Amino acid sequence: NSANLQWNHYAINEILVKDSSASPLNANIATESTSEWNSENGGLLTDGDHSEAAQSADRITLPTDIVLSWPEPVSFDQIQMHCWYAQNQAPTKVSFQVSQDGQVWQEIVPPTVLAWEYADTTLENQTFSFEQVQEVRFLRMKVHDANLKWKHFAISELEVYNRQS
């Protein structure tokens, strides 16, 4: 469990969730699990705009969860997370789970340590591929650790793809 904490936070610039059955605008962050966000709207994670980011509260306690929900079930087999100033504010260890009901969760990506190269406006991404999950209504990303140089983490976009469709 480690993070580049030079600025006392980590950041994920954005998380875009999309596939053939659910547009990014249909991926809403579950409010009950994102109480630590500073951003006006966690929807910045799924708006398709890499120039804006959702940001955690300063001095956030880790681990913390980010939960996305869809109004209708979706299928996907890949997640991409995009961050800028990643060495200063990106997650450095994450895992992902899915659920059909928001109660029972299945791990699809175990805790994974992430390496970031840049501390500037370079938009970096991390890709997580796995066996296709179907009939999913909830995606939970657990941020175990992060670069917290600026006392928070930020995500520009979180994207979910169904490459098998």
Segments and roles (model prediction):
Residues 1-6, 142-149:
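Short beta-strand-plus-loop segments that form exposed binding edges in beta-rich domains
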Residues 5-76, 84-90, 110-122, 152, ...:
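Disordered, acidic Ser/Thr/Pro-rich linker "stalks" and the adjacent N-terminal cap
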Residues 78, 138-140:
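Short, conserved beta-strand segments of beta-strand-rich sandwich/propeller modules, principally
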Residues 80-87, 144-146:
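Solvent-exposed strand-to-loop "edge" motifs in beta-rich extracellular domains
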Residues 94-96:
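Short beta-strand elements bearing conserved aromatic residues within extracellular beta-rich modules
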Residues 105-108:
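Tryptophan-centered short beta-strand motifs
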Residues 123-138:
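Short, surface-exposed tryptophan/glycine-enriched loops
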